[in-house]
Amino acid sequence: MLGLFKSVVYQLNTLILLLPLAIAGCQSSTPEVDPASLVSRNDTQLVLNNAVLEQSNPQSNTVWKIKADNITYSDNNQVAILDKVVGNLFEDDLVILKISAEAGKIENNGNVILLNGTVIASDPRNGSVVTSESIEWRPQEDLLLIKEKLEGIHPNLEVTAGQGKYFTKIEKLEIEDDVIATSKQPPLQLTSDRLEWNIPQSQIVSPGAVELVRYDQNKTITDRLVSDRAELNLTQNLATLNQNIELISSSPTLQIATDFLTWNYQERIGSTDRPIQILDRDRQISLTGNQGEIDFLRQIAKLQGGVKGIDRQKALELYARNLTWNIDTEKVEAEGNIIYQQTEPKARLTGDSAIGTLKNNNITVTSNGTQQVTSIIDDTP
């Protein structure tokens, strides 16, 4: 009977062998089984109990190894049906992927393995774990096709999505459909329709529209950002956003608009070398510049390259080459080609630098650092 079984297995796939030995990874060891108990045979089917299968490449290196409680071959011996599956994927004799599932099926000479029912795939190289109800494993392509809702877990990141792919060679997870990625420290949540996670590089790329929400330790939202594209470096806590960016902060209550932003979501510091607008809706203050940086924790904004500040409540405008704004106190310091004008009383000042506060129209403009520039009052009715 055992000789007949070996003959049938080799006809199915010369690279698949029955091995009564231990399997590494998903189970630390497999008890030795009496060969006589391994095989039962109906008229048209071969059934293996507590069996181990493995496939090797032309260089005789093990590609994968699978253990199942029961293995039933189809009538033509082209498909193997598996029950209670654990297995490993190898590269250079090292385990690079561990899998387990309630059920499975081996097709296409061992090049396609379908797994179903609480499928768990873990990569010991990076500590990531993916779970789903259905995964297609293609060992020769170094690919997992995740066809149903999935959850990915990493020491500092969790992701969920409708479907995805995991490229085992490069340790990259691509997911799509209702993507949510949550970072634990600092607390950050990303939502998108598509996401690429390069795990060894600790990099996340959202090639489409994305929303980032930052939380404090009390799970209160501090910042919300949207853009057309985003890239995150999880090690540096740095997000790089492109096109149609809007940042809304709750403390202080500001709205930022630009087309490019580098955002340290740990330190809450944003910087850009593109035109930027900062809007304080409560106080009706607007600042625009050709580049700038804002530090929300210190409540300091610095704009350069041609700056315009408007306080609509006080009906005043301030123009400068560079400007620093203390968001809390409304103190401003500006330099270069200063123009300050107000409506009540009507005045216009020019000079090289300016300092003061917007909330009480108290702005001092100087020229060459010493000479006070005289106000020009227009009394024309």
Locations of regions flagged by a protein language model:
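Mature-chain termini and adjacent capping regions
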Residues: 1-381
